[in-house]
Amino acid sequence: MALLQQRKQEIISGYQTHETDTGSADVQVAMLTERINKLSTHLQANSKDHSSRRGLLQMIGRRKRLLAYILKHNPERYRALITRLGIRG
């Protein structure tokens, strides 16, 4: 489930910390969240797609590690990010 280039640019511009930022933890978490949301809807319609389910779990694990890194280094930025993305209840 690849994201369209235009959607990627929208996400990057919305979460980047400076002009040329494309790979900060915030941007990575936002991109992973978008991919996770797309894959979740795919799996609701295709419940027997086990390879995609495995990929989803890997993406969730990667996002969890990135969020732990952000929380460790900048708790205020972490709280703002999860609120903005609408994750963590």
UniProtKB/Swiss-Prot annotation:
Biological process (GO), any one: translation
SUPFAM superfamilies noted in UniProt: S15/NS1 RNA-binding domain (SSF47060)
UniProt keyword annotation of Cell membrane present: no
CDD domains named in the record: Ribosomal_S15p_S13e (cd00353)
SMART domains xref list: Ribosomal_S15
One Gene Ontology MF term: structural constituent of ribosome
Alphabetized InterPro entries for the sequence: Ribosomal_uS15, Ribosomal_uS15_bac-type, uS15_NS1_RNA-bd_sf
GO cellular component, one term: cytosolic small ribosomal subunit
Keywords: Ribonucleoprotein, Ribosomal protein, RNA-binding, rRNA-binding
Keyword rRNA-binding included in the entry's annotation: yes
Gene3D superfamilies assigned: 6.10.250.3130, S15/NS1, RNA-binding
UniProt xrefs under Pfam families: Ribosomal_S15
Family, similarity comment: Belongs to the universal ribosomal protein uS15 family.
Subunit structure, as described in the record: Part of the 30S ribosomal subunit. Forms a bridge to the 50S subunit in the 70S ribosome, contacting the 23S rRNA.
Function, as annotated: One of the primary rRNA binding proteins, it binds directly to 16S rRNA where it helps nucleate assembly of the platform of the 30S subunit by binding and bridging several RNA helices of the 16S rRNA. Forms an intersubunit bridge (bridge B4) with the 23S rRNA of the 50S subunit in the ribosome.
NCBIfam families tied to this protein: S15_bact
Protein name: Small ribosomal subunit protein uS15
Organism: Cyanothece sp. (strain PCC 7425 / ATCC 29141)
